[in-house]
Structures are given as C-alpha cells and as structure tokens.
Swiss-Prot record:
Keyword terms: Cleavage on pair of basic residues, Disulfide bond, EGF-like domain, Glycoprotein, Hydrolase, Metal-binding, Metalloprotease, Protease, Secreted, Signal, Zinc, Zymogen
Cofactor binding annotation: Binds 1 zinc ion per subunit.
Pfam family, one: TSP_1
Protein name according to UniProt: Zinc metalloproteinase dpy-31
Propiece residues: 19-127
UniProt organism field: Caenorhabditis elegans
Gene designation: dpy-31
Length: 592
C-alpha cells in the first residue's frame, strides 16, 4: 500500500493545536498483540549483548564518578509501583535502553563508553547526528511502514503524529508496507517506547517501538524525533549552564543515563537550550525515590517547564527546520518576535506561541474566550487575569498578552490573589499553566506557573516587552490574576562572575557561562546569565578516531563460513575536522 501525506483540514487543525491524548480504543479494534504478527527484535541478540556490556560499564563508571548515596527505608515493591505510575506520564523513561528509549548500535555504545573514559582529555571523533551519514534526505519522502502489531486506531494516531511533523517542516512521509529494502522506519510493538537516533547509515530499516502505553501523540512525536536525529535535550554538551544533575538522587543503575553528548556529535544549529522541549527529561526522571529531584533548573522558576510530553516546542520545530529545511526558501522574510520563514509556506513566517500574522507582527487572539492582546503599560498598575476570574475558567481556553513598556522602562509583573492551575505535583510538571517570557528572545520557552498557591515571584523583563500566555488544555479551575506596570530602567547589576571554564579546547565545540545578580530594589534590564561559544581556534594535532578495517566476523556461523566483516577500530590520527558541526574554518577560526 502506498500513501503520500496531504494536508487534511481536520487533521491539520487537530495536529496544529496540541499533541494531546485521544479517546479510548475503538471497540472494533483487535488487541495490539494480535496472533500471527511477526515478532521482531530491536537488534540482534549478539549486538544486544555488546550494547549491554558497554552500558553496564558506563553505569559503573558513572557510579564511580558520582558515588553519593542517600539511604532510605522503602519497600522495593513500592518503589517499583511508583515507577509504574510514572510510566503513564513519561512511558519512554521506563525502557531498558540508553536514556530509557534510545536504541544504540554496538559502535555507538562503545564510543559513548570511550568518551566517558576520556572526558576532558582526548577528543573521540564519532559519527552521530552531527554527521550527514545519519541524516535523512529531505528532498525525498521518508518511507515508513507498519509490521502489523498495531490496531487500526493506533496506526491512525501514529500517522497523525507524522502528519504533524509534515505540516511544520519540509519533510514528507510515504507509507509502503511492502518495502523490503532501503532506509525506512518500521513501526512495531516489540519493546516499550524506543528508537534509534537518526537514519541507519547502512541503508537498512530501523524499528520504532510503540507499545500501547506509548500511543499518545506527544510520545510518538518524541520517538519520531529520535528517528529523525534528535538526542535528549538534557544531554546537550552545554546543559550544565542551564540545569544541575543531582547525582546523589539518581537510581544507582541509572547514572549512566545522564551523560552528556560530545560536542563533536551534536549540531544544535545555534538553537539555544530549551526547557520546554518535548525531548527534555522531567525533574524526577530515574530518581531512586519519587520525591527526589534528579534535574534542577538553574533558574528555579523553570522547574515546572521541563519534561512535558504534550506538544513540540517552537525550538524543537525550529531546530528540525534548520537541520533539514534551511535551503527550501530562497529568500528569508523579515520575521519578528523570533519567527522564521516557514518552509511549508515561504510567503509567511512561522511564529512563536502567542504571535501570528505574515511576519509575526500580531498577538494571537484568544481561543474560547475574549482575552489577551497588546497592552501598552504606564507606571500605573494594569491587571490581567484568566477568563471570568475569580470564577473558574473553562477547559480549552487560551489567552496571549504582549505587555509593552515605554522607552527607558521595563515590565514588572506579579501574581496577586488566589491561584490555581492544574499540575502533576508528584512530577513537578505543569499540565495547564501561565507562561511568562521575559528574555530577549520570545522563541524560547518561558517560565511556567501552575499548581496551587500564588507564586511569590516578582518578574521583570530583559527588554521593554514581556509575553504572558494562559493555556488550559486539561481542565477548568480558579485561574490567576496579576498586575503589571512599567518601571524605570534604573539601577545597575552587580558585577559579572568570572567565566566558567570552556567545555572544549578547540573547534568552537565548547561554551562558557557567567552570571550576575540584581540588587534588591533595582530595576535591572538585560539577562542574568550570559553564555558564549569559546575556544574557536581550529583543532590540530592528534585525535582518537574511528577507522574501519576488514577482519574476521564474530559469531560461530561466521567463523565456520569464513565470512569477513568491516570492523571499527580506535586509532590516534591527525584530527579530521578542524571545527565542530555547524561551524566552518575561516582564517584559522571556526565561525558559524
């Protein structure tokens, strides 16, 4: 069966709005594990043993580096039950694979271990998404198929997630269940939620496993993002500038899941770290007890932003388009508010949440209520609130405000009165929320506020503008009320802290950070944290590199038949790449 996606009006409307759960299974659908379905494995038994070997060594190495332990008296069965409850929200964390849902090839597992051994000493060159070998050809449809292990309803939901990726990027997907060779994605139900990262470099099929608990649009979009080349957000080389990993709170056998990627392997295309990414772990992922944080955000008000599995963030989409679609539109539009030229419609901009219009020049109108808009502030207080406050708002209502202070002023925002927005308290995660974007780039996900009790934070903008978003996806509630005003851009910051050490020695592969604080009572403008690329000189000298050599294959049958295989070997050789992915060499320096 061949099928090329076209844009269906109803599906587009559903997909563009939000990747939410759908209703219960259709009664006519057969069980997902229907008899007669061909059983598959994510990889061969021999390859699995190799990967398990290196993953075990990785966990032991991480445990040696971070030996902190917290002793608690808790029934192991209760701990297992807590994790089973967690799987409802983030089922991809419960898998047996690397970081829960990433299926590594043997050479990848070995390279990860070698990187961990030599961290900060030797550059180990590897071919992950930073290499074109694992990127799909955006000029051709990506072939996908089902192996028969999903019901018709489950297939429809999976295709809706693909349709969403299709609508927001230049990528096209084509179904072909009869294809038996070449690169293609095969959806199966073989082992929880799991996928490889990027295209198979040898032109073979790759499995994306989606068990019944994974059939949610947000989780499917997450796994498809892996197949298209995305790693987890908190694995970025620069993550320590945004979050702190609480090693002492991580389950003993899971510390290897929090290793960072080598800068050589990841091309972030200049897109900043994204707390709201659908690829980010939640706050308590892989914790040894359900009340312990394993990831703490550097700015505490971002804590409830991380870990969502509802929708692709604007920066998730922007990164995918930068990697695959940057050449689609011959000319770029003068997009505002962090927008960029839409590769699906080159005559319009793709806008961050809260903005619309050809150039993102308009504030998005309210949905399900008359609310939001652009408000020009003065020094007098202006109040904004959820629809109907203090009465309860309704499920599905959305409001967007752009608060603008006059020149020489910034925006001051503070919650007042009763506050209630639906959240998952155990997971420290907002389901419905008020989001405040106060940075210099409105493309970045902001701080999300939810749960019960009025947030005490007094928020000030980095510029004359601030965006406030009210989103009620799941249920009604009391909502919020806040006051905003323009305050003079007065008072100075305290001095910057010293720069942190650069995370890499050359090639523009590293970054560094410094911070500053605003004294109480001052209305400081600008950002409290600054990061920059560092050590941009070209890499020279010797690097640990992967080389292919012909040798005897492993396995009894291969030895018996005398089969020869191409094998990887790590050797010291002159560095192949002078610059990290996304940078080019110009006059001895690596520039973007």
């Amino acid at each position: 069966m061949h099928k090329i996606f076209i844009i269906f009006g109803l599906l587009s409307l559903c997909a563009a709005h939000s990747l939410r759960d759908l209703s219960n299974k259709d009664e006519e659908d057969p069980p997902s594990s229907a008899p007669g379905v061909r059983k598959r494995r994510m990889m061969s038994e021999e390859d699995q043993k190799t990967v398990d070997y290196y993953m075990d060594k990785l966990n032991k190495l991480a445990d040696e580096k971070h030996p902190e332990e917290i002793e608690r008296h808790k029934n192991p069965e209760l701990v297992a039950w807590d994790r089973k409850r967690d799987s409802v929200l983030n089922p991809e964390e419960q898998g047996k694979f690397f970081q829960g849902d990433i299926v590594l090839y043997p050479e990848q597992a070995k390279a990860l271990y070698e990187q961990a051994l030599t961290e900060g000493k030797t550059r180990v060159k590897r071919k992950f998404i930073g290499s074109n070998l694992r990127r799909w050809d955006a000029s051709r449809p990506i072939i996908y198929a089902f192996d028969g292990s999903h019901t018709q309803r489950e297939q429809r939901i999976i295709e809706l997630a693909l349709e969403h990726w299709h609508n927001i990027t230049c990528l096209n997907f084509q179904r072909n269940d009869q294809a038996n060779s070449g690169n293609r994605i095969v959806f199966t139900d073989v082992d929880g939620c799991a996928s490889n990262v990027g295209r198979h470099p040898l032109g073979e099929e790759q499995l994306v496993s989606l068990a019944p608990e994974c059939i949610r649009l947000g989780v499917i979009a997450h796994e498809v993002a892996h197949a298209l080349g995305f790693w987890h957000e908190q694995s970025r080389p620069d993550r320590d500038q945004y979050v702190t990993v609480r090693w002492e709170n991580i389950d003993k056998d899971s510390k290897g899941q929090f290793l960072k990627e080598d800068p050589d392997d990841v091309d972030n295309a200049g897109v900043p770290y994204d707390y709201g990414s659908i690829m980010h772990y939640r706050s308590k992922a892989f914790s040894k007890f359900d009340d312990l944080y394993t990831i703490s955000t550097y700015v505490t008000d971002y804590q409830k932003t991380i870990g969502q599995r509802d929708q692709l963030s604007f920066n998730d989409i922007r990164l995918m388009n930068k990697i695959y679609c940057s050449a689609v539109c011959p000319s770029k539009l003068p997009c505002q508010r962090g927008g960029y030229t839409d590769p699906r419609r080159c005559d319009r901009c793709r806008c961050p949440d809260g903005f619309t219009g050809q150039y993102c020049e308009q504030v998005m109108p309210g949905y399900g209520a008359t609310c939001g808009g652009k408000i020009s502030l003065t020094r007098s207080t202006t109040r904004i609130s959820s629809p109907g406050y203090p009465r309860e708002f309704k499920e599905g209502q959305e409001c967007s405000w752009l608060l603008v202070a006059p020149p020489g002023h910034i925006v001051e925002f503070q919650f007042i009165g009763e506050f209630e927005m639906y959240c998952k308290i155990r997971h420290s995660l907002c389901m419905d929320y008020v989001e405040v974007r106060n940075s210099t780039d409105f493309a970045n996900t902001g701080m999300r506020y939810c749960c019960y009790g009025t947030p005490p934070t007094r928020i000030r903008s980095a510029t004359t503008d601030m965006v406030v978003l009210f989103r009620s996806f799941y249920r009604g509630g009391k909502g919020f009320e806040a006051r905003a005003r323009a305050v003079p851009e007065a008072g100075n910051w305290n001095s910057w802290s010293p720069w942190t050490a650069c995370s890499a020695t050359c090639g523009a592969c590293g970054s560094r950070m410094r911070t500053r604080t605003c004294p109480p009572g001052n209305a400081c403008s600008g950002e409290p944290v600054e990061t920059q690329i560092c050590n941009t000189q070209a890499c020279t000298g010797m690097c640990a590199q992967k080389r292919e050599e012909e040798g005897q294959c492993g396995g009894f049958l291969s030895l018996l038949r005398g089969v020869r295989c191409r094998q990887e070997k790590t050797v010291m050789a002159p560095c192949e790449n002078a610059c990290c992915p996304g940078f080019t060499l110009q006059r001895g320096r690596c520039v973007r």
